[in-house]
A protein has these predicted regions:
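An N-terminal assembly and electron-transfer interface module characteristic of large anaerobic redox
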Residues: 1-393
Length: 393
């Protein structure tokens, strides 16, 4: 049945994704709602809320404000809040209410800029899409507004040694330590400085607010770690000539050591991490086999509940919409190994039971044919990898 959820909780909407991108940048983030959407962001969709400050506000829309289109009241609230806080910009994030009444975000942004005397960006999310759509809009708007185009392009020597990392959010990586790990990876493996836009820079490199975004044209290459950041990477390539690579550099920690040769495998995650896990498994299969002339690779399918970019997909990759889609896929394809969020474990078990096949829940019970391996995705379960490890300990 369309839209019926018996196993999975609702996924984070687009406004949550937009907030996730902007959360650490030192701006005043106003969610244009009556209060409920902001409560969901703070309570469920943004794990940094419990340990890291951000100026995140609800517009506190009342019924008559929405019906009569009293945008001036929102402007007054923003002016008052901005005057009491040390913020560098204001971001207005859309929700279903302004979408229904047809709010003109560009006009609202101009009204605010005149009063605030600081940059104002608006993200026209409507609460009807998933988190990655909001992230994609926020990444694009961020660099369109703040990346300094007036500066002359630096020559390659001045750019050498700096790598930008696009797409890092807790929703996508499920790991609050991912920025630190990625910086260490590029420093140790390539001797280069990784600039993790929008996540982990305040603590890791003591760089605050929009400093990195303004100098986005001063890196030699961008690394794209989620499909939501691909459009921004293309924009930066067009604007500054900065090439990009789509990968997840610390993927090795997501793939446990076991024999994958000849296995039929399903990976369910966001598309870039799923692709990186597939490439890592293939690399390990080839390394174990040792003979490139012998094809002992696993047969691997990547699937996702979220955006699947055609240019990043292989033949047979799948975009999931309903729980029944997933269960039917597992029943029909009879995978040896499934990588997915733990929230999907019971659903996978039930799919195998319906098919009348055996099942092994432990990733290390390699004697059994069918194996489920935890691949935590915060956007699916609202759990971080650190949380899942603590539960297992």
């Amino acid at each position: 049945m369309r839209g019926l959820r018996k196993y999975l909780t609702p996924f984070a909407p687009d406004q949550s994704g937009a907030v996730s991108v902007l959360y650490e940048l030192g701006g005043l983030i106003a969610i244009c709602d009556a209060g409920g959407c902001t409560g969901n962001v703070c309570g469920f969709d943004e794990p940094r809320w419990f340990e890291q400050k951000s100026a995140l506000f609800s517009a506190g829309l009342r019924d008559m404000d929405a019906i009569l289109g009293r945008d001036d009241r929102l402007v007054e609230k923003l002016v008052d809040a901005a005057s009491k806080l040390d913020v560098k910009f204001v971001a207005i994030i859309g929700t279903p209410v302004p979408a229904v009444i047809g709010t003109d975000y560009k006009a609202l942004g101009r009204m605010c800029e005149k009063r605030l005397n600081m940059p104002v960006i608006t993200i026209d999310t409507d609460g009807m899409e998933l988190y990655d759509v909001g992230e994609e809009k926020a990444w694009l708007e961020l660099f369109r507004t703040f990346a300094e185009k007036g500066k002359p392009n630096l020559d390659i020597e001045k750019k050498r040694g700096k790598i930008g990392v696009l797409g890092l959010t807790p929703q996508d990586t499920s790991d609050l330590q991912a920025p630190k790990k990625i910086r260490e990876y590029y420093q140790e493996k390539e001797g280069k400085e990784a600039i993790c836009y929008c996540m982990g820079e305040n603590v890791g490199r003591m760089v605050y607010g929009l400093d990195n975004d303004r100098t986005a044209g001063e890196v030699e290459k961008n690394i794209v770690v989620s499909p939501a950041a691909l459009a921004a990477a293309k924009y930066l390539e067009k604007t500054f000539g900065t090439s990009y690579e789509v990968t997840y550099p610390i993927v090795e920690e997501l793939v446990p050591d076991m024999d994958y040769r000849g296995k039929k495998i399903l990976i369910v995650h966001q598309q870039v991490i799923g692709n990186a896990m597939r490439a890592e498994i293939r690399r390990r299969c080839q390394k174990v086999n040792g003979d490139p002339s012998v094809d002992n690779n696993a047969v691997i399918t990547v699937a996702s509940w979220f955006m699947m970019k055609q240019e990043l997909s292989e033949e047979g990759d799948i975009s999931l919409r309903e729980e029944d889609d997933y269960m039917e896929l597992v029943r029909e394809e009879d995978y040896d190994i499934v990588f997915a969020d733990p929230m999907m474990k019971r659903m996978t078990e039930d799919a195998y039971k319906m098919a009348g096949t055996g099942y092994a829940a432990d990733a290390y019970e390699t004697e059994r044919k069918r194996i489920f391996i935890d691949a935590t995705h915060f956007a699916v379960s609202g759990k971080l990898r650190e949380e899942m490890k603590k539960r297992e300990a």
